[in-house]
Structure formats: structure tokens, C-alpha cells
Amino acid sequence: MDINSFNRVGANIRKAGFLIVLFYLLVVLIMKFLEANNFFGYSFSMLSNDIFAPPSLNHFCGTDRLGRDVCLRTLQGSSLAIEVVFLAILFSLSLGLPLGLLSGYFGGFFDKCLSLIMDTIFSIPVILLSVVVAFVLGKGILNAALALCIVYSPQYFRLIRNQTILVKSETYVEAAQVSGADVKTIIFKYILPNVITPLPILLTLNAADAVLVLGSLGFLGLGVPADVPEWGSDLNLALACLLYTSPSPRDKRQSRMPSSA
């Protein structure tokens, strides 16, 4: 197999990944549009639907013990996951990027203090730290995003700081300093464009990990309110059925859809 064949395989893999991500984003956008028009208002009623109903044309994956449509609730949970993850990554980037730039450029005591704080936060396991922060802040979409923000901010800080330390020693930066350019110009014109290139990779990794952490918080009852469709809380509800009743096909069906998502 020659180099061109490898390139074609790599291109096909990238296209497949792009199509998968595009499909999920399309589903999320459709669900948000339908939610905005109150299309799913009926799915939350415990009186209109039978509990533990089997799959049918009306309920593709059946209903749970509260009479809610499992399939629709899982799809609605996808829009919530994207919303919380987007806010968390945005907050983390907004905090870690400027602090990393300033710390890496100025150095000294300021750099040591920030690095110590961020390294301390980074040393704590992600799940443990997110659980503690979510417990302190309480339930809510914004609080869940803030909990994830505190968890992931040190990663952006460390990445940008290390890149800034490398870039500020380059010849063009030193030339700008000698020519009398102010700090703002040096940071935003010469350093920032050259330190953000690794960010898309970290953003992708954190987004995937944040979905798992959000599900863990919901499973422990520390994420969003119980009435909001969320994968972790739905799995917790399904687990209660499996533990306290005989695991019948209807109980397995209730947990299969959120776990596969």
C-alpha cells in the first residue's frame, strides 16, 4: 500500500467522523427547535401514557416507570448535553486562555502563584472535583457548566502558558520588544495567533470527556434538576428499577437507550 492509499484512507476516516458529528448536531438542532415550539409537552405527562409501555409506533423505545417516552427523552438529553458542554468549554477557555497568556509572558511571582493554583486543581481527579463543586453550587444547567469549567480550566491554562513561554523567546517577538511595541500588541498580535493552534485538539478531547462527567453528575443526582431530560439521571432511574425489581425486559429497555447515547 503506497502513501496515496494511506492518504485516501485518512481522508475517508475524517469524512466519516465529520458526518457523524454533523448528524448529532443536526439532531440537537431539530430537538431544540421542537422544544421551543412545545412539541414534547405531552411526553412529560404521567397520565396520558402507560407506564413501562413496550415499543410501539407511538413510543419507539417504550416508556419508563413515570410514563415518559424513553426515545424522546434520550434525544432531548442530547440537546442538554451539547448545551452544557458548550457553556463549560466556553467558560474554561475564557478563564484559562487569558491567564495562561499573562502567566507565560510575565512569569515571576505571578506565574508561580497561578501555576501552583492550577496545578493543585489539576491534581484532583476530574470526577471527584466536579462532584464537590456541583454539590456546593447546587443543581442547574449553569451550575453544572461552572463545575465543568473549574475542572477543565487548568488544562487550557497549562497548554497556553507552555506555548507562550516557547513563543515569547522567538526572534520575531524579541524584535517587536526591541522596536518598542507595547505589551498588548506583542501578546495579541505576535503571541496569541501562534499559541492557539493546539486548542482544537484539546477542545475535542474535553468535549467528549465533559459529556461523560455530566452524565456522572446526573447519575449521582448532582447535575440538572430531575424534571430536565438528562442521560445520567435517566440511567439512575433505570438502575433503581433493575436493583429493586426483577430485571425484566422492560427494565433493561429503559436503561438501554440512555446508555447507548
Locations of regions flagged by a protein language model:
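Conserved small/polar residues in nucleotide/adenosyl-binding loops
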Residues: 244-251
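Transmembrane alpha-helix signature in integral membrane proteins
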Residues: 70-105, 250
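Hydrophobic alpha-helical transmembrane segments of membrane transport/permease proteins
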Residues: 19, 23, 27-63, 220-229
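Transmembrane alpha-helices
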Residues: 79-95, 184-215
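Non-cytoplasmic
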Residues: 131-132, 140-145, 149, 199-234
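Generic hydrophobic transmembrane alpha-helix motif, especially the helices
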Residues: 60-64, 95, 104-110, 114-166, ...
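N-terminal signal-anchor/first transmembrane alpha helix
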Residues: 1-41, 117, 195-196
